[in-house]
Amino acid sequence: MLINRPRYYPFYIFLLLSHFVYAQNAASGKITDAKTNKEISGVDVFINESNKPAITTTSGNFMVQSDSIIYKLKFLRKNYALETVDITPENATNIFVKLSQEKISDIQEVVIHNERPKYKNKKENPAYAIMQKVWARKRNNGLDKFDTYTYKEYEKIQFDANNLDSAFMNRKIFNKLEFIFEYKDSTASGKIGLPVFLNEAVYDNYGENRPSKKTKRLLVAQKTSGFQDNQIVTLTAKNLYRDINIYDNTLNYFDIGFPSPVGETGFSTYDYNLIDTVSVRGENAFKIRYLPKRTDVLAFQGYLYIDTDSYAVLGATLKSTQKINVNFINGISTELEYDNPDENTFLPRKFVTEIEMTPFSKKKTAKSIVAKRSVDYSEYEFNKPLEDKIFKRTEEEYSDSFTDKDDEYWVKARPDSLSKSEKGIYEMLDKLGQTPKFNRIVKLYETLGSGYYNVKKLGIDIGPIFSVYGKNEVEGDRIRLGARTYFTRNDPWRVQFYTAYGFKDQQVKYGAEARFMFNRVNRFTLGAGTRRDILQLGVQLTNDDGIMARTFASSTIFARGDNASLSSLNQTNLFTSIEPWKNFQIRLDGTMQSIKSANPDGFSLMYYKDGALRKTTNDSHFTLSLIARPGAKFSQTGIDRYEHGTLAPTIVLKYTRGIEGLFGSDFNYNKLQFLFYKPFLVGSWGKLQVNFEAGKNFDTVPLALQNIIPGNQSYSLAQNTFAQLNYYEFVADTYTTLHLEHHFNGKILSFIPLIKKLKLREIAFIRGAYGTLSDASKAINVEGFKYSAPTDHIYYEYGFGIENIGFGNLRIFRVDFNWRGNYLDRPDISTFGVKAGFQVNF
């Protein structure tokens, strides 16, 4: 429910960048025939990626205006080749355009006026015959066919603020920041624009397919305007984009699936219309226009350029519909170019994606951030011998030397030179970084995003601010204060602690942990910590042994029924971890702990040991964890990393060995646990989240060390718990659980009139648990007769939820409706419940 996680950073960055804003909103000039130099009329003039011409000229002169940025004009007239002009403040007037009948044009998105033809069935559509041949000859990325390959990648990400006016400049927030408007562009319509962020990066890519599969993407150089030390801004910039393959059936934007117009299922979503044959970089190509059959679903519109001989995709344009139902997003536009070295493969050439983002409003005139990412792929080399050491991680890769490149390097590295406005971003933000007021604004949003307030002079973060207050039956009102060391985003060590006080039990609680990473390559780390606290155990199966790991200590302010099943925990932990391979971690924990009931009158953890009755469970154990995150991407190289949004799975295998007699431990036991979690895109039907867990205690242990099927008696959303289970209702020596949660992204509700205007999104879920509990495990506990496992039947819950509740682009509320499927004869159960919470995502 809390929103202090890296995946929520886009929400905060939109709020920040909405204050700082580049625009050119008018352009004029003359159009002539390139051969005769005579003026031409009847020319369609298109602004940016618009599907409709802004004007059709009646003379050789033209003038266009727009409420948004004009960065490109396209000119088209029958029997003439398309001409494109990039617009900057310097060339926006007196543009001289020459149209030629003989020029071979690059890929461009234009509209040739024609009605959408109607066919009795798709087989009558000539575009269908073409697409069938595209599917039959579906190409694979050419990199897969070679034994080895290398190529360079230049990436540029730019944020421009849009749709500002003179009144905005006069706001108090810009007091003492007026100098930023020296970089503005004023237009005839009175709007103002301002560049706010620029990031450039150069990568060397290496790959080997045979004899073994290896890849490496090496960051060679990076240059960021003013935000090198701001984790939120840089992470957000990188986190907006995903790699896509136009031949896939589903394209991933923001981890949301959009049907691909080139996918084999495309005709179920799109109408296709063969427009013409055109020349694309010297190749003859079919130009096919596609439109979604329904504009209120997640889909694109645009053009496909298909080679007339090989039926390869030479290029494509993808533009979102006006009714796009994605939070914080007003529009998406992508241009793709491919090279086709042979009849079976393709190679990426250039990808350009623009995303228009607003934190609140969907209106076209709303103040927004236009985020543009362009990637150029070049210098392909194939079957060149590559040494094994190239694929090995080295310490140099994790240093900051890639930020030390001089201006001369960047002039050579860029495929195209920077515009005047792009160069101004570096200068402006360097000045902003020296301005106290700007730094205070950045700190505010960084605090909201990270959950910590940084005291830079001391190198300390205070927080997390979202855990300051809590309430439970034992402690009553609870105040928690914490801090951690934080000097830079790449700190190799961290010390953190917290202290808490309950006004009902009048007890002080605390926790502290120190960690040090010795090697950035294999992330070899040692850590130690201790805590004394009141916790809600039994709400996680595959839990983390770390002292500062997420717990359910006292965050339940509103709950159904009395929650008396809290435990008092004294715990000390030592651990070491290493990543021998990328995204694969081996961790060994040694833990000594004592557990007793924090509320003996309402909740018993008493058990029998050698005929004696005991109330405290003393435990010493070692835990070996194998954690795999294939495909995960991270920012920073320090002790704490920030994860980019991906569909990477999480796979965990844990073995725990309890040792009797070690530091007074009461039990020998062996436990094995497994966890698998992964989100799957299911075409245009949304995203399915799968969470499977299984485990077994091989020995008899008391309740404090048992596997508890996680319940949730709060009214808040809690991932991977059972909403209608009470705490400790099911206890198991052996267990399996499965959680399936499908997000339809509004697919079903979009069919319902009136309701679809609300842009709500539906969720369906089902959860199940099965387990066994031995008689010995029941007998060891004083109140063992109360506990049982879901053995007779698989316990299950089901329900649906509504997410995306809110207004405009601010739709962060979710409500779930849960039903208990069986075991309905038990006392004090709840058969139906409502959970709610905040969920900040796209």
Q: What kind of feature is each model-predicted range?
A:
Residues 25-27, 34-49:
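Short, ordered, surface-exposed loop/turn motifs in non-cytosolic proteins
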Residues 111, 116-285, 291-299, 361, ...:
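Structured extracytoplasmic
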Residues 47-49, 74-85:
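A short, solvent-exposed loop/turn motif at the edges and junctions
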Residues 256-258, 382, 391-842:
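Exposed, low-structure sequence patches enriched in small/polar residues
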Residues 95-114:
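Conserved "repeat-terminator" motif of extracellular CCP/Sushi domains
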Residues 37-41, 63-70:
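Short Pro-Gly-centered beta-turn/loop motif in secreted/extracellular proteins
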Residues 27-33, 60, 97:
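A short, amphipathic beta-strand motif
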Residues 50-61:
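Short, acidic Ser/Thr/Gly-rich low-complexity loop/linker segments typical of extracellular
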